[in-house]
Amino acid sequence: AFYRAAKKADSDLSQYADVDSCAKLWLINELGKNWDSGVSSVYFVYKQDSDGNYKFFGSPVWDYDNALGNAAGSAWDLQNFGVKDYTQYSGWWCRFKDRQKRSQNSSNIINNISRNTQVNKAAVNI
């Protein structure tokens, strides 16, 4: 249910997840240009919130060996390590450059969460 809700920009993600922690997880991975984020190196913790409801929480970030400018390739293209062009990244940079279609990877949970209306509203307040 959480994954299906994350795939819809207008879904009520707060039923399944702590929106603030999802927004923080998205922002720190986007700002850190974490290449692995959302595909293989992201964790969510399932625990009780302050109201006693069980929800998914964005967990601490990890696996930053390919982040912060250390990788510029795609998939397993190991010959493209080292940043050559910061504009090739997806997420906020593509939206800033009005090229959102490049970030439409439906298997990337962080890309899905980044398009959620609730997460975008929460991100402004962080």
What are these regions, as identified by a protein language model?
Residues 1-103, 107, 121-124:
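Conserved kinase catalytic-core segment
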